[in-house]
Amino acid sequence: MIEANALMKAAKERTGLSDWGDDWYLEPMHWLVDAINTESELTEFGAGAVPEMLIAHLVNQLEVNDWFKRHPEIGEVEITAPLFGIGLPRTGSTAFSHMMGLDPATRILRVWEQERHCPPPEKATELTDARIAISQAGEEGFQQLVPEATEMLPRGVDKSQECAHVLMEAFSSGPSFELFVHVPSFNARTIAPEYESNMVRAYEYHKRVLQLLQWRCPPNRWFLKTPVHTYDIEALLKVYPDANFVWTHREPLRSLSSVCSLIYHFRRAFVDNPNPVYLGHEHRAYWTTALKRTLNVRERIGEHRFHDVYHRVQIVDPAKQVREVYAHFGWHYPAEMDGWIAGWQEEHPKGKHDARPEFFGLDPAGVEEEFRFYTERFGL
């Protein structure tokens, strides 16, 4: 059994810190621990790895709060018009974010600085930071544990990481935790309408992390991405009212089958009950709601705040889509960018990933009908 108080004690001992700041997130942390204990059947590896993951989130919370206390000027750092990648999962958004991050003028959330935010990175040492080697060792271990991951996702510790991991440090975004553990009760609580005020607070923490990372390590033009922003876009906009969005698109059945397969392979390392049919049912309902929410927001705040990127085009000519994003938002497109993208493609050939919808209880005809509002809107 995982004990929440023991996790908090371990985080305090590792950091020498004890001030949790605005500690609202400790309540959902207790919810999560209860759900893991009652709903997840942890593997031997998971029994060790899951508590360590939770302690790491608490460590980041303690350290971020401490840096803001000692350097209140961090709170004055401006995060201006961040560009967020949204949309269904498994739409090519990870590859797209890696390519967007090739531009030195664009700031991304790199894997190594996401895993441990503090001390805040500095421009002079960002390429030699000791955390890079630590993160690389962890990545190599993970690839041995889940070898399928290398086929499913382009990876690299100096490449962009999904910023859902920052929301996880606020013990929000239940679907993100479900990548590792089976916690349906926690997931239901964090996606319920009454949780939105807490999601706003989670995004406020998200912004504090960006301020910390940008403070001594520009550039200041952020590109961030995670599909869960699609569900929580209202909360996001309350914290980032000038945000713009790149919306990646793919046929829903392919997207749902692929994300369920990805989660299933990840989960098997951590739990003995990966529940494939539950994954299909849960993600079908979740993403239907998420897409409808974002469509409503798009109608309200305007088409000019969004640009659409299509998986079918990206696999043929990704540079074309990146150029179009730059043009839409008025960014300068470097002359070298096409070459950088071509080089990235050579280093990251597309992997093979077979996902069978029926294994996850996904009925093709039913999915087609349920997502018709979306596929007809975007010509999928």
Residue ranges and their predicted role:
Residues I86-L88, F223-P227, H311:
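Short His-Asn-centered micro-motif
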Residues E115-W222:
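PAPS-dependent sulfation machinery
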Residues M1-D66, P184-Y203, L210-C217, C260-L380:
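PAPS-dependent sulfotransferases, especially Golgi type II membrane carbohydrate sulfotransferases
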